[in-house]
Amino acid sequence: MNITPRPAGVGETVLVSFQLDKTSDTAVGAAGGDHFQGFMIDITRPDGTKETKGPYEAWATSGAILTYAPTSIGTYTFQASFPGQWINASGYERYFKPSTSNPVELIVNEEPTDFGITSPPLPTDSWTRPISSENKGWWQVADNWLMKSYDYNIRHFCMTPAFSPYTAAPDSAHVIWKKDILFGGIAGGVFGDSSYYTGLSYEQFYDPLILEGRIMFVEHPPTASADVFGTRCMDLYTGEDLWYLEGISIDFAQIFLIDNPNEHGLIAHLWDVNGPSSNATATIYDAYTSRHIFTITNITWGRGVSFYCGQPSFGPSGEILSYSLDTANDRLMLWNSSKAIFEAFPWMGGFPGEIYSPRVGAIVDGKLGIQWDVPITVDVDSRMTIELLDVDEGYMLAYVESKLSRTAGFTEYPATATEMAFPTEISEGATSVSPIWTKTRGDIHNRNFYSRNIEDGVYTRWDGALMRLMGYSIQTGEEIWRTEPTSDVGWGYFTYQFMIAYGNLLMAGYDGYLRAFDITDGSLSWEFYFGDVGLETAYNTLPNYSGFNIADGKIYITNDEHSPDSVLWRGSKLWVVDAYTGEEVWSIAGMMRHGAISDGVYTVLNSYDGQVYTFGKGPSKITVEAPLTEVILGEKVIIMGSIMDQSIGQMDTPCVSDDDMSAWMEYLHMNKPIPSDAKGVEITLDVIDANGNYRNIGTATSDLSGKYRLVWEPEIPGDYTIIATFVGSDSYDSSFDEAFIYVEEAPQSTAPPDATPAPMTDMYVMGFGIAILAVVIIIGILLLRKK
């Protein structure tokens, strides 16, 4: 047996493991066959008292682990015993004799022992994947973007906010790289100010996924959104092409956690799903190589949450879950990708889930993935659909509006609607499912939209005709609050975007506002206005149509509409707004829809020019120079150098302040004028003198050329190391450089030698010259007087 950690502290949990040196003849997999039983653990405390734990059953591998928390200082003694056991195998019996382990001592101190194992702190500079598995805690700033709307597969031209709760996100408009993926911007000539087709109406030329530092997006022709060229993969940090899947449309990525007796870790897949929702086919690819692995057929791909097609969700281990509401037969079904795979490829002995081994080229029957398919205990309207699904919260919401029989197929407003809440999980062996609650909503008008998620038990509904919000309890269905009209501008009717994050319902639309409402009482927390633009648009302001991204306490939102004219309006920006206060963090020119955020990087297509812009911190390079010749003590030294951006997008251009970053990037990348008043960054200068003393000698700010200088006078003679440091900013990583000087002691002053008398001839000539000069001066004065 073994105990860890040793030594331990009072109250600290230790792991007590025991292991028999033989295995059962009949043990199969993790749970099959006969396992050894009756293990006892005898514990002697420091005061001599005893306690016994057990009996325990071993795993198939003849060992097990239990936990124990010592309560007093001193030495504990542990000893394991096995009582012996008959194992009845096929055709014979085997007896395993009793045995007792050697005693193991555990020294317990007042405090836990520090074994010196630490993880690096969270990064402040930029970084790239892979992340070392030793860097515990980095999950707090790192995340992937597996679906087009983070954890929603579909990102239509509207209804597409997305919330990534873990990843860091850019705090400035600094561009890491840009890359054109299609023609964009003004063509010129006879076409005047007309721009190339943006694809914002339907095609959506850039709906990126991000997996392990790789961007994947589907390429469409500019002529038809249903047609597909293929899926392209690029490096998140450089824009470099990595692979291309010809003719394949990757719908989403998956990271699946496998955890069985022999396999532990994450596996990444790419999914291409096609066919009707009642009988879909998923083709699964390896995410690293893009090679085909296996195919799942006969999938019931539930409809709901997003109009147009089925909407999968992730389960707790990353499995793909698809809920289906069968209104024709009043049934509710859950399909689980992992169940289908486990059932198709069981461990030896027929135990699904004890190994993950889908064979290359295999075809899996998707019907094996039906986790449950149960009747609903009440009649369900045939038109009812699942409108809201939140697996983390454990609820789904079904909705249907009333229709009058005399106008079959049409709804007369105001109308009534029925809502039903169902659980996303039901108990194993359940033979039916009932709604958690059913509510009839009155006074329903056109354009009802739900929040994309549930938070703290609250979901919201938007009545566009009256421009008001309602908040409801998902546990009871009761209305908690409702607002007055949220806008006094008629364009507020066209509001599509609703997402709950950080305790607020966030919404944006055509009235030019991004607003936040407290989900506990519906009060307005803050609002952000995009500004007046007069006749530049038909709205007097800049609308939002396509939604927004939320990450790292910030909201990334752009100005756009469904089908912008070929002569695009001016003034659209990517706005980054503090999600808690509604204050602007930064903004940059561009019509930038449907971006994705991962690991502190934001990538998005700018419809103004057809280029992908990827924002985030980039590397910097600082240099420092000092005189190469010796310096005499008492003389001043000019220290100079430069600080340059090393990002691929603008390699070796000057670093500028965060406050001027947007204008600087617009100048470098968007044909805008140079911001002549832009400021540089602050450089710290330190020295190590001949005595080994380290001290600061001042700071300098770089200019628009990237250069800086500092005048300094050394205090003592000897060798100096000059260190120039840039601590980094929201835009750039830190960097430093060194230079060296030698300061010589000033020479000792000596008395001049006795002067040698000048020859008489020299004195004569000198005197004559002085006399002539005096005459010239006098003549000049006289001439001036005559004037």
Language-model features: where?
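Enriched for extracellular/lumenal, surface-exposed ectodomains of secreted and cell-surface proteins
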Residues: 76-100, 719-734
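Structural beta-strand segments of beta-rich domains
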Residues: 12-16, 635-639
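Sequence/structural signature of beta-propeller modules
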Residues: 106-182, 351, 359, 624-626, ...
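Residue-level recognition of secondary-structure-to-loop junctions
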Residues: 65-72, 76, 702, 706-716, ...
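Repeat-blade elements of multi-bladed beta-propeller folds
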Residues: 18, 129-132, 136-156, 190-231, ...
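Blade-level signature of beta-propeller repeat domains, shared across WD40, Kelch, NHL, RCC1
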Residues: 581-632, 638
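Secretory targeting signatures
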Residues: 18, 173, 290, 477, ...
